From Swiss-Prot:
F(1)F(0) ATP synthase produces ATP from ADP in the presence of a proton or sodium gradient. F-type ATPases consist of two structural domains, F(1) containing the extramembraneous catalytic core and F(0) containing the membrane proton channel, linked together by a central stalk and a peripheral stalk. During catalysis, ATP synthesis in the catalytic domain of F(1) is coupled via a rotary mechanism of the central stalk subunits to proton translocation. This protein is part of the stalk that links CF(0) to CF(1). It either transmits conformational changes from CF(0) to CF(1) or is implicated in proton conduction. It holds the Pfam family OSCP. Its main location: membrane. Signal peptide: none annotated. This is ATP synthase subunit delta. Belongs to the ATPase delta chain family. InterPro entries: ATP_synth_OSCP/delta_N_sf, ATPase_OSCP/dsu.
Length: 181
């Protein structure tokens, strides 16, 4: 089983259990903190993924790092992950948990790239427009790329809306080349 599939299954199972048990709000913040801790430490990632370190040592490592910072339910989940020899995919589980939670809450992520910085009113108008298009709440991550020349490009999931001047010029170039041929 691929690590992405396994990560999604563990995340889904934990999300479902947390929702049914009424502790989803508590573990959401804890899961985010675990993910941030993993993302900040390559050494921790390597240790959890290492086949040379046994499950008991990984459990002990997770307990040392997180016992004071997370509640009983989250600690039980971390122990389970280590016991099942899935500690190496813990980072993926935290990402999948966040994605499933966003999906449950009707939130989509949009990567917005613009040629210049957008004003607050432009960002709000863009978000409203994207929310109207998707029917979901949009969380935008803004990035500036001057090579776009003007306009912007938006990526939501697998869909890209490219309204940049660079893209329009590229399309025009392709049409001109096709006419000449």
């Amino acid at each position: 089983m691929s690590s992405v599939i396994a990560s999604r299954r563990y995340a889904y199972a934990f999300l479902s259990a947390a929702e049914a048990g009424g502790f989803l709000e508590t573990v959401t913040g804890e899961m985010q903190m675990v993910g941030e801790t993993l993302a900040a430490s390559r050494d921790l990632q390597r240790a959890l993924a290492s086949p040379l370190i046994n499950a008991d040592r990984k459990t002990h490592l997770l307990e040392e790092i997180f016992a004071e910072a997370v509640g009983d339910k989250m600690m039980l989940f971390l122990r389970l992950i280590a016991h099942k020899k899935r500690a190496g995919i813990l980072g993926g589980i935290t990402q999948e948990f966040a994605a499933l939670l966003d999906e449950k809450n009707g939130i989509v992520n949009a990567a917005v790239t613009s040629a210049t910085e957008l004003s607050d009113s432009q960002q709000k108008a863009l978000s409203r427009s994207l929310e109207g298009y998707t029917g979901k709440k949009v969380r935008s991550a803004m990035k500036i790329d001057e090579s776009l020349i003007g306009g912007l490009s938006v990526k939501i999931g697998d869909t890209i809306f490219d309204g940049s001047v660079r893209h329009q010029l590229q399309l025009l170039r392709e049409k001109l080349v096709a006419v000449e041929a």
